[in-house]
């Protein structure tokens, strides 16, 4: 009795709860979102290319608008993301689907301008890059067209990381693509994988007596 009383009197350490798993899209939702962009207009081709950069390269909205034509290496099929005070420089492979979409935009969508920004406005004078807030509006409108709950660009980045981990990509590789300086920021995608396994796990069979 005395031991039990002492045990109750000893303060227990507070256990930090794991962060909630990030919201992600299912593959069919991602396809529906991308197919919602009208590719028959120059502006639609630009916005479709922006959406693919978010989905396939897992870029942040400010990284998308920061891209320049000089960041694309068509021979090596890579895209370079410049270094900032908070982020280190990254070199990412350029998937064929993204390369074709960007090339289609450059040939049939991007207005003539001296700006080196990859994505520019479609109202004169065409000499400035888009803003990150505009990119977020583009994606929220796409969700609305699909009849889905409007979400920010971060859900596309989270979806890429989650599905990359489920396909067997290591956390170090995912961290390199996302530009995380520490693996601690990437651990949450491993937690998502565990939760998915828990959800689909079969119940333990009952013992027949």
Located regions from the model:
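Conserved catalytic core of the tyrosine transesterase superfamily
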Residues: 1-209
């Amino acid at each position: 009795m005395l031991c039990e009383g002492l045990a109750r009197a000893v303060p227990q350490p507070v256990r930090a709860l794991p962060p909630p798993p990030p919201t992600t899209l299912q593959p069919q939702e991602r396809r529906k979102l991308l197919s919602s962009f009208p590719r028959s207009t120059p502006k639609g081709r630009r916005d479709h290319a922006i959406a693919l950069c978010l989905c396939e390269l897992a870029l942040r909205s400010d990284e998308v608008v920061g891209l320049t034509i000089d960041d694309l290496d068509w021979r090596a099929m890579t895209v370079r993301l410049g270094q900032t005070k908070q982020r280190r420089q990254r070199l990412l492979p350029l998937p064929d689907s993204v390369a074709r979409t960007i090339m289609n935009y450059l040939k049939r969508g991007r207005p003539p301008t001296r700006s080196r920004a990859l994505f520019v406005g479609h109202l004169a004078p065409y000499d400035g890059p888009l803003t990150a807030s505009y990119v977020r509006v583009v994606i929220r409108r796409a969700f609305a067209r699909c009849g889905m709950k409007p979400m920010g660009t971060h859900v596309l980045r989270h979806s890429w990381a989650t599905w990359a981990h489920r396909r067997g990509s290591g956390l170090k590789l995912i961290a390199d693509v996302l530009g995380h300086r520490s693996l601690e920021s990437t651990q949450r995608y491993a937690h998502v994988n565990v939760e998915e396994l828990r959800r689909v796990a079969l119940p333990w069979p009952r013992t027949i007596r």
